[in-house]
Curated annotation (Swiss-Prot):
<keyword id="KW-0698">rRNA processing</keyword>
<feature type="region of interest" description="Disordered">
    <location>
        <begin position="386"/>
        <end position="419"/>
    </location>
</feature>
<dbReference type="InterPro" id="IPR017237">
    <property type="entry name" value="rRNA_m2G-MeTrfase_RlmG"/>
</dbReference>
<keyword id="KW-0963">Cytoplasm</keyword>
<dbReference type="InterPro" id="IPR002052">
    <property type="entry name" value="DNA_methylase_N6_adenine_CS"/>
</dbReference>
<dbReference type="GO" id="GO:0005737">
    <property type="term" value="C:cytoplasm"/>
</dbReference>
<dbReference type="InterPro" id="IPR007848">
    <property type="entry name" value="Small_mtfrase_dom"/>
</dbReference>
<dbReference type="InterPro" id="IPR029063">
    <property type="entry name" value="SAM-dependent_MTases_sf"/>
</dbReference>
<protein>
    <recommendedName>
        <fullName>Ribosomal RNA large subunit methyltransferase G</fullName>
        <ecNumber>2.1.1.174</ecNumber>
    </recommendedName>
</protein>
<keyword id="KW-0489">Methyltransferase</keyword>
<keyword id="KW-0808">Transferase</keyword>
<feature type="compositionally biased region" description="Basic and acidic residues">
    <location>
        <begin position="386"/>
        <end position="408"/>
    </location>
</feature>
<comment type="function">
    <text>Specifically methylates the guanine in position 1835 (m2G1835) of 23S rRNA.</text>
</comment>
<keyword id="KW-0949">S-adenosyl-L-methionine</keyword>
<comment type="similarity">
    <text>Belongs to the methyltransferase superfamily. RlmG family.</text>
</comment>
<feature type="compositionally biased region" description="Polar residues">
    <location>
        <begin position="409"/>
        <end position="419"/>
    </location>
</feature>
<dbReference type="GO" id="GO:0052916">
    <property type="term" value="F:23S rRNA (guanine(1835)-N(2))-methyltransferase activity"/>
</dbReference>
Length: 419
């Protein structure tokens, strides 16, 4: 992994979060470099600056290296982004003192004088962010947005103009461009949250703007819902929960269970929380809080007192724009550590991702529950708590092994297939 950042005289050591990822991925891209280069060339002085979508803190660290007391507020929806920012400030002995950390729903301060943004892939979320800015930015405030040149087109510039103010793009540098937007001072209302029904499950689902599958079930969740495990589960984690539909349906199937929703996206956690309340799933007479909601990097900060007997998992294989399998590795390993002995990890994924190899290495067993041409559902059972599982990536030969249908693990018949 390249960790030496160097642009316009700024030298930093930057790493992705968590650090133990594939060596070919780095914590910044040319769009970060272009934005910093632009600030240096225009001799930008330290003013109250909002930084939005700074994946691992490259922009934050650069500004604090230019001026250690540069007044900053940093907004992110991803917990790994927040942790990456803090990690890289500490690595470079830069102070985080005075930085205001915000999630993507918290009210923005009104004293912002400059905004630096990375263009997100999700343009619905981007429009939401622009609307939020329109509610606090005075007329004439400069907003700089960097992205790959191929991601910037007439439609994007029109979207910015509609939701914040007139925009124009720079010349291309390293296949990136910087958009300059000048706030027009007009206040826009936030877009309404998406809400849709799943009649066969008797569920209403609400999605905030940065949550995957905005207005329908994604295909992976669909096949998972058709092949939920069977058993007497009392503690269930919906890991990478998104809008929470797997955990919601698990509560319908296992009303005596306590459900723990966990996701890297704060908007996902808020969506799951709203959907729990919307569908009124608390079981009468069951003592205590029946659902918890954790904005977390997988299970890194989950209480050790939570010992699930079932983890439901639909792992992402993207982190930002990077394709990576480290999230799946982390989810599987942390699930193994968290599960009770005999507990089950129930996973859905694309067939080509070869999750069966990872599960076999960690759990020493793996069963194919169901599959179609694109997706496969796998189940692994924790049958030993004595030794840490093997944690390295598969060899090239292992990665070519095909998923095969197999019988359930002899200690588990806890799944059912669609009738």
């Amino acid at each position: 992994m390249t960790t030496q950042f160097s642009v316009a005289g700024i030298e930093l050591e930057l790493a992705r979060y968590p650090k133990d990822q594939e060596s070919n991925l780095q914590a910044w891209d040319a769009a970060d470099e272009h934005l910093i280069k632009h600030l240096i060339e225009t001799e930008q002085t330290p003013v109250v600056t909002a930084i939005i979508n700074d994946n691992f803190g490259a922009l934050t660290a650069c500004l604090r290296s230019i001026a250690p007391t540069w007044p900053l507020m940093v907004e992110t929806d991803a917990k790994t982004s927040l942790l990456g920012n803090l990690q890289n400030l500490a690595t470079n002995n830069l102070s985080s003192e005075g930085i205001e950390w915000l999630n993507s729903r918290e009210a923005l301060p009104e004293q912002i004088e400059l905004v630096l943004m990375k263009l997100p892939k999700n343009l619905t979320y981007f429009a939401h962010q622009l609307n939020r800015l329109s509610q606090v930015l005075p007329k004439g405030t400069q907003v700089l947005i960097s992205a790959k040149a191929k991601s910037i087109n007439k439609s994007v510039l029109e979207l910015i103009g509609k939701n914040l103010g007139s925009a124009s793009a720079s010349l291309t540098w390293k296949k990136t461009r910087v958009i300059t937007c000048i706030s027009d001072g007009e206040i826009r209302s936030l877009p309404k949250e998406m809400q849709w029904s799943v009649p066969r499950l008797n569920l209403e689902i609400r999605n905030l703007s940065n949550v995957f599958a905005a207005n329908k079930l994604d295909i992976g969740a669909e096949i998972m819902l058709e092949n939920m495990p069977k058993g007497d589960f009392k503690s269930i984690i919906d890991l990478g929960c998104g809008n929470g539909i797997l955990g919601l349906h698990a509560k319908q199937l296992f009303p005596q269970a306590y459900i723990h929703f966990v996701d890297d996206s704060e908007m996902a956690i808020e969506s799951a929380k709203q959907n729990w309340a919307l569908n009124k799933l608390d079981t009468q007479g069951l003592v205590g809080e029946q659902a918890t909601f954790g904005w977390d990097d997988c299970l890194t900060h989950m209480s050790e007192g939570v010992r699930p007997d079932l983890v439901l998992c639909n792992p992402p294989f993207h982190q930002g724009e990077a394709i990576t399998d480290h999230i799946a590795w982390q989810m599987f390993l942390q699930s193994w550590r968290a599960l009770k002995n005999g507990g089950i990890l129930h996973v859905v994924g694309n067939r080509h991702l070869a999750y069966h190899i990872k599960l076999q290495r960690i759990f020493k067993n793996c069963t194919t529950v169901a599959s179609n041409g694109k997706f496969v559902i796998l189940q692994a059972q924790k049958i030993s708590k004595k030794a840490e599982p093997f944690e390295t990536h598969p060899t090239e030969a292992e990665a070519k092994v095909e998923v095969t249908e197999s019988k359930p693990h002899p200690q588990s018949s806890l799944y059912g297939t669609k009738k």
